[in-house]
Amino acid sequence: MIPPKPRESQWTDEQWQAIYATGQHTLVAAAAGSGKTAVLVERIIQKILHKERPIDVDRLLVVTFTNAAAAEMRQRIGEALERALEKEPHSLHLRRQLSLLQKASISTIHSFCLDVIRKYYYVIGIDPVFRIADEGEMALLKEEVLETLFEQYYAENDEPFLTVVDRYTSDRTDADLQTLILRLYEFSRSHPNPSGWLQQIVHMYDVEEGARIDDLPYAHYLFQAVDLALEAAEYRLAQALQKTKEPGGPDYLYDTLASDEQVIAKLKEARHESWQQLHEAMKNVSFATAKRKPKDGAYDEQLVEDVKKLRDQVKKEISSITEELFSFQPVTYVRHLHEMKPIVTTIVQMVQRFAHLLQAKKDEKGIVDFSDLEHYCLRILRAPSLEHELKPSEAALYYRAQFAEVLVDEYQDTNMVQESILRLVSNDDEATGNMFMVGDVKQSIYGFRLAEPSLFLQKYNRFTKDGDGGLRIDLAKNFRSRKEILDGTNFIFRQLMTETVGDMRYDDDAALRFGAQDYPDKQIPVECVWINEAKEESDEEEQEDVTAVQLEARWIAKKIKQLLAEPFFVYDRRLKGERRLMYRDIVILCRSMSSASAMLEEFRKQNVPVYAELSSGYFSATEVSIMLSLLKVIDNPYQDIPLAAVLRSPIVGLDEEALARIRLAKKDGAFYEALCAFVQEPHDDELHEKMKRWLASLSEWRTAARQKPLADLIWQLYRETNFYDYVGGMPGGKQRQANLRALYDRAKQYEQTSFRGIFRFLRFIERLKEREDDFGAARSLTEQEDVVRMMTIHKSKGLEFPVVFLAGAAKSFNMQDLRSDYVLDKDFGLGMRFVHPTWRASYPTVAQLAIKKKMKWQLLAEEMRILYVALTRAKEKLYIVCTAKDMEAKKKKWQEVAYTSTWELPAYVIEKAKSYADWIGYALARHQQGICSSATVLHDPSLWDIHIVPAHELEQEDAQANEHRDIVEAIQQLQPVAIKSEYEEEVNRRLFWTYTHAPATVLRAKQSVSELKRQRDIYGGHAEQPFRKELVERPRFLQAKMMTPAERGTMMHLVMQHVDVTKEVTVDAVREQIARMVNGEWLTEEQATVIDVESIVAFFNTPIGKRMQRATRLEREVPFYLAHEMEGETVVVQGVIDCVFEDEHGLVLIDYKTDRVSWMNDPKQQLKRRYKGQLALYREAIEAIWKREVTETYVYAFDGALLVPMEVD
């Protein structure tokens, strides 16, 4: 029963329903910015706080898409419980929920699977001691197993295998067939029953020779392709006929066009009969010869040309679909399928054998991947011997009893295996079930991860708003964006997103509704710019060769500068008002980062700070390339190119002349041999000595490579060559050092896998390069820096920005998968080309043709969803940036469909689009503010600012950017620059300006607690000045090699932070913990020796220490910032509280000290005097954060194991 919504509630009616609805499976279709996470958290909280039937938080299974989302969810729930506890401070139920929260099942699906496996591993007979392998390790392992697989087949001289190799590999390599095996294996793992799915592939080719194409399971997609072609032909003929009736139109062609319409009508009739009849009709199509233009007629030449062009397009459309789908008789297509069955059977057997070998290898190494986690979990939860049925096992029944509700975030991104797992742990009856699913199928953009949006769509279409057989709730109100952005997005997607191409219809339920009422009332249109690359003939030779990427970057840079100069104001909800736009408010979204480097270079020239996490460029970075070359030489010095690269690099620093001298020592053979011969010659010049020293170092490094971990070797190289410090002094040194640290970290991760050694690491790097799987430049920027962000649309999902630029909208869709010789589909399996056994000619099979058609529509649907994600990231201002080679030709093409009577654009138009710009152009051509002068769909409420920028304007701006180069060069050379007199007054005003609050400048805006302690004279009145570090320190080589008291205190605090209070704290237990911290590199062995273990154990033997171990809540090393009044100014106090715990007596605050109290006369009183003020600040901070009073405060001195209670004022 849904409770009535209070009048003052901030929730919408739909959100309120989503929070309280129960009794059946519920699907919440949450549009972008609709507050779905807030709704999900509130639903969980209300279930926990229910007055009559409260549920413990650990009886809820909450599945999120990422670990970050799970952590945020847990944090939000914790904060909500804290707020509830403030209102009911004595509630044992709430305290219990806070204690249960940390072990509650709020995680990704993989984390939940891991928990299930850890608990029930014995059910499926696997070793519980395993680790999760990373992608790099698995790639190497799969490559190794593939090689083993092919070696075995070749050794067996297997005839069916050799037939497959003969027909489907090149003369030089088996790489194509190996890739197919690997892709089939990976694809099968997204199915709940991989082996069954592979067998289904074979069944798809189990076709009798007399079968009809109409009866094949994928025939629908073939017919649909024909339908779209005929629809396009009909539409164009209708346009052509209309033009013949216009004044000056070629009416003499009317009868010819009417005849063409009859041809199309006959094709449509045949299409509804059978594929055989359609085949015959398509092959026998004959268009009438067009009548000649009468000599005495006065005709508009443009209309004549338009009609002829439209008719040519019709003929080309019919010819193209005929050539694509009707090249062979239907009986031939069927025969090809029949003859392909032995081939497909062999390939499937190879995949199954590969899976078996790979599993054995993983078992041997004790590793699993994320796919294994899902399948192991499914095997545990599914009842045995029911491979094709989804019946719960005893383990699944346990979880069904355990979880009162299963809540799934981002449900549109689940796959079929994950869906099966969720069904098994929930009540699977949709009418009375307990699964709550939240998502937005319009944002399902992870097809490359084999996500299955159809699972969401099926439920969306099956569930009803009244809950009959499952409840559907639409959250359409968007609380993120301005109304203009939502109206613009709706205008585009009402026309684009159809069931034929977009998988769903963008109707009123799917449309975005404005909900962010706090925005100031002003109109900010969506801006769409087309940069026209068409060159004027007179200027063509003078224009520079600028790419589309550079042009877009220049326009964006110009606009960003303009926005900051105007200035443009954005609404800040934290300030509850407007503020000036900052760089960090702006994001540039790209479909991919392939052109990011070129854009970044252009922004650098325009002095616009832009940061992007590049997915490529890491291996080509100079510093990384040099270090990899050095590793190659250490592995094998008989490699000329890496050796020459190292010798020419700053590590050695030879020039061409030196290299030539070395080569003359031995003109033949490897360069390393020449180098060895060179140093043995009787010379004593500087080059000989230098190379002798370097060869000695190389020998030491080669020995070290055999004796120590790879990561340690790399750090040794950084240290001994000084290369790390050297690149730090180069331009972009911070980024270069980050790249070198990334190489060290990657080597460290590699050593933790089942592979070892420098040779295999280098081979692993080479494989990454071959697959174009770059690491991307290492991150050297924090999120808080004031720069423009550039990222992919995928990376932006879930984020929001005040100003969004969608760049590269005219870039063509990636249809590379459709050009492959084989295609895969979850329903229809494998589509391959038929290779004639004698002629070796290859032809597409009907299965391949159908699957390719389906794939294309799926790819377009996903591209449509990606565009939707991009447009809905913007909060206040959206720019769509496109380029066009010939804008007039584009406008003419878009205008052809502007007269469509329905909101939805014709499906063939959407299908034939090559880019986002095409889709947007077709849509905007029909808007009253659109590019084309006349349209059918008019007076839409969306506001657009659409303009065309000639490319030459941006090319001229590049020259203008360089006009002050002489001034810049003068400044760089420290030469005086004459300044115009009109600026003198302003310059002088700025130079001689004085700050009215100068006294406040000597008081730091942010103070540490220790600094405040000294300033307050807490030590007893003798410290007149705050402690300041000596400006000149003694050199390190003159300092004593011993640990300072401050360092010792840090080590003691670190150990106290990690003491396991859930177990008895003994001397042995603490020593074991210190040993683990040394192994984990938390402590060095030297630092471990100064830890006073006995004083740590002594603390836990005190009454307070024992109470800490029993506490209901324990927080250690709690950082805080506190606004504090000081000398009439507000400063921010920063500190870290050692320990706070809560038990039945209230909040207890403890601070650890390493002071030498044994030297004090009255240690308790001295500690109280010394730290009274500091502990008062700590108490003030905790009470402000936790909203509760601190009842007890203590100082514990390790020296003497002295526990001192502090007075609480």
UniProtKB/Swiss-Prot annotation:
The answer to whether keyword Repressor applies is no
Q: Which GO biological process categories is it annotated with?
A: double-strand break repair via homologous recombination
Keyword set for this entry? ATP-binding, DNA damage, DNA repair, DNA-binding, Exonuclease, Helicase, Hydrolase, Isomerase, Nuclease, Nucleotide-binding
Catalyses which reaction(s): Couples ATP hydrolysis with the unwinding of duplex DNA by translocating in the 3'-5' direction; ATP + H2O = ADP + phosphate + H(+)
Cysteines joined through disulfide linkages = none
Which InterPro entries did the record assign? AddA, DNA_helicase_UvrD-like_C, DNA_helicase_UvrD/REP, P-loop_NTPase, PDDEXK-like_dom_sf, PDDEXK_AddAB-type, Restrct_endonuc-II-like, UvrD-like_ATP-bd
Q: Per UniProt, what is one Pfam family of this protein?
A: PDDEXK_1
Please give the superkingdom of this protein's source: Bacteria
Q: What is its EC number?
A: 3.1.-.-, 5.6.2.4
**Quaternary state and interactors:** Heterodimer of AddA and AddB/RexB.
List the NCBIfam families: addA_Gpos (TIGR02785)
Q: Which family does it belong to?
A: Belongs to the helicase family. AddA subfamily.
Cited function:
The heterodimer acts as both an ATP-dependent DNA helicase and an ATP-dependent, dual-direction single-stranded exonuclease. Recognizes the chi site generating a DNA molecule suitable for the initiation of homologous recombination. The AddA nuclease domain is required for chi fragment generation; this subunit has the helicase and 3' -> 5' nuclease activities.
Any idea what this protein is called?
Answer: ATP-dependent helicase/nuclease subunit A
What is the name of the gene encoding this protein? Answer: addA
